[in-house]
């Protein structure tokens, strides 16, 4: 790999193996999120229930609890390029299956579960490839680029889901998504192979007990490795928390648009997801080009307090807009642009957390440990996030979306105060 001291996005993209991996990530993440949000819109429109949407997200998240650690350990010993290719191809086939069953919620939950199971192998295979393809001096910038792609694909997936359903209908939408997975597998196939690694079949041919013992041993080593480094544990905790919160907000999105903003569910992306994604893009670009020169701890601390405060302000605005005599101040003409701005700032705050935390995790986790740590991340999100995600949907149906959002902001702010006190101590 040609060494370069130019810490820039152009410098990262100029490295062809990284560029192919990045293109593959764009297509794959866009396909994943368009699938998820298309199903969320279909389900909410047919049921009108935040809880039903929460179950959909749980169907996608539970496999990370059950198989995240196992997948991370297995991927450690495989050619990660081949893992990515196979995952993309099989997920393309699964999306075509939705073509026939999307009107049956239980079958949708089942197919999405299998889809998410494959993603457990995809995630720990993709992120650890970055340090192998990029010089250490460009790692923060490369992670910034991947964060930009990841979160913009979340927003673009939500943005495309509504118009696709309106213009093409569900069947053609699923065909388009399946094609994106195939294109992603093509780009990843251009990334150089890893040498001296085992095949999946050679691993599975081993005695099952021996394999299980190895998995448990590797998991124990991974847990010990994380607990031995305060920086690594802190980064893992922050990434877990941000992903859980984003998942909760994602489950509340359709209900927020319908019951609070009182707009068409399919337009939720315009007033909710789009500003968040724009903010994430701006934040990631700033961190990657300028912000990386500042203290990672300062960036993270700013992100935590900003996110908590913004969520509470959003909830307060919603509350005031329903108070008799205050409606004229917070009518839709003023309320929608104001909420757009706040969701934009929420996206910026997320980037201040995500990019530095990912960089800390990758720089602290050495060698094959990276895959195990990312496997632990996906398992933690699926395991720890089960209760908050389902509770968020149930509480939103029971007490209202606004109160749930305020509670999230309050908890985040308390965590920021606790972390600040611990850091100063």
Describe the role of every protein-language-model region.
Residues 19-36, 59-73, 79-92, 107-166, ...:
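Substrate-agnostic recognition of the 12-TM MFS/MFS-like secondary transporter fold
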Residues 2-19, 194-237, 260:
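Juxtamembrane intracellular "pre-TM" segments in multi-pass secondary transporters
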Residues 56, 66-70, 81-83, 87, ...:
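C-terminal transmembrane bundle of multi-pass solute transporters/carriers
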């Amino acid at each position: 790999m040609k060494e370069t001291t130019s810490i820039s996005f152009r410098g990262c993209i100029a490295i062809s193996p990284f560029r192919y991996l990045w293109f593959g990530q764009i297509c794959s993440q866009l396909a994943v999120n368009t699938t998820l949000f298309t199903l969320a819109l279909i389900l909410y429109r047919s049921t009108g229930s935040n809880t039903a949407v929460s179950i959909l997200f749980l169907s996608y998240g539970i496999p990370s609890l059950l198989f995240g650690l196992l997948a991370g350990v297995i991927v450690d010993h495989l050619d990660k390029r081949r893992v990515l290719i196979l995952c993309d191809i099989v997920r393309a086939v699964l999306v075509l299956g939705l073509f026939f069953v999307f009107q049956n919620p239980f079958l949708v939950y089942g197919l999405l579960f299998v889809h998410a199971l494959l993603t457990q192998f995809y995630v720990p295979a993709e992120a650890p490839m970055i340090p192998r393809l990029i010089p250490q001096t460009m790692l923060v910038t490369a992670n910034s680029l991947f964060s930009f792609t990841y979160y913009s694909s979340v927003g673009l997936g939500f943005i495309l889901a509504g118009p696709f359903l309106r213009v093409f209908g569900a069947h053609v939408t699923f065909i388009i998504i399946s094609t994106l997975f195939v294109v992603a597998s093509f780009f990843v196939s251009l990334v150089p192979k890893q040498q001296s690694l085992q095949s999946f079949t050679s691993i599975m041919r081993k005695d099952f007990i021996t394999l299980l013992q190895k998995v448990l041993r590797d998991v124990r080593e991974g847990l010990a490795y994380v607990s031995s480094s305060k920086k690594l544990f802190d980064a893992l905790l922050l990434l877990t928390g941000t992903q859980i919160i984003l998942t909760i907000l994602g489950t509340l999105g359709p209900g927020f648009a319908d019951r609070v903003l009182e707009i068409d569910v399919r337009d939720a992306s315009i007033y909710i997801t789009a500003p968040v994604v724009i903010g994430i893009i701006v934040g990631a670009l700033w961190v990657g080009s300028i912000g990386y020169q500042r203290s990672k701890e300062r960036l993270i601390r700013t992100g935590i307090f900003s996110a908590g405060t913004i969520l509470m302000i959003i909830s307060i605005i919603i509350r005031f807009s329903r108070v008799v005599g205050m409606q004229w101040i917070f009518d839709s003409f003023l309320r929608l642009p104001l909420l757009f701005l706040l969701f934009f700032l929420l996206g910026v705050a997320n980037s201040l957390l995500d990019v530095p935390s990912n960089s800390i995790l990758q720089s602290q986790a050495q060698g094959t440990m990276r895959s195990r740590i990312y496997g632990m991340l996906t398992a933690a999100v699926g395991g720890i996030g089960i209760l908050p995600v389902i509770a968020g949907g149930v509480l939103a149906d029971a007490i209202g979306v606004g109160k749930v959002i305020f509670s999230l902001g309050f908890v985040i702010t308390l965590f920021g105060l606790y972390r600040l006190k611990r850091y100063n101590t």
